[in-house]
């Protein structure tokens, strides 16, 4: 279980969250929905320790770890896909996949097919549409087989089917 407690976020005089809490069960789909500009993306940044809060994973405090161990925790347990997916521009999607394979991640043929990854492998991120970038980023995140997958994306049929 992942819990965030006592999350407070303000920008200037505007308070977005005051003493907010959140709980999500691993292996379950949890959806945060709201209007554009309502703070969904800001709230999701708390999962990356971008804000001060109490952060518990399986009952253990993570927010009190030193920076190096927090980063290890994030890498070992979380994968995040941002609204604007992040890629290394000089690498094709296939090169991104190969880099993950070098780190021990495995291809997932079912997701590869469902997300339409094969036709994207020889393309550079800058040549992809927004939807193609999102699908590629989701696939790369899934290759890591995270316990917690955070998707700050617009849903499309191909992503919803996974």
In which residue ranges do the predicted regions lie?
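Conserved ABC ATPase "signature" region
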Residues: 105-120
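Hydrophobic anchor residue at the start of the ABC signature
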Residues: 138
């Amino acid at each position: 279980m992942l819990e965030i407690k006592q999350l407070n976020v303000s920008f200037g005089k505007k308070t977005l969250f005051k003493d907010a809490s959140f709980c999500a069960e691993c292996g379950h789909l949890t959806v945060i929905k709201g209007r554009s500009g309502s703070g969904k993306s800001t709230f999701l940044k708390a999962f990356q320790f971008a804000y001060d809060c109490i952060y518990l994973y399986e009952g253990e405090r993570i927010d009190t770890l030193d920076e190096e161990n927090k980063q290890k925790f994030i890498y070992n347990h979380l994968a995040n896909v941002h609204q604007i997916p992040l890629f290394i521009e000089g690498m094709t999607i296939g090169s991104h996949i190969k880099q993950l394979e070098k780190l021990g991640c495995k291809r997932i043929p079912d997701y590869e097919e469902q997300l339409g990854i094969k036709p994207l492998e020889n393309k550079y991120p800058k040549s992809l549409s927004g939807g193609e970038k999102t699908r590629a980023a989701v696939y790369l995140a899934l290759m890591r087989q995270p316990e917690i997958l955070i998707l700050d994306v617009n849903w499309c049929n191909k992503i919803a089917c996974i």
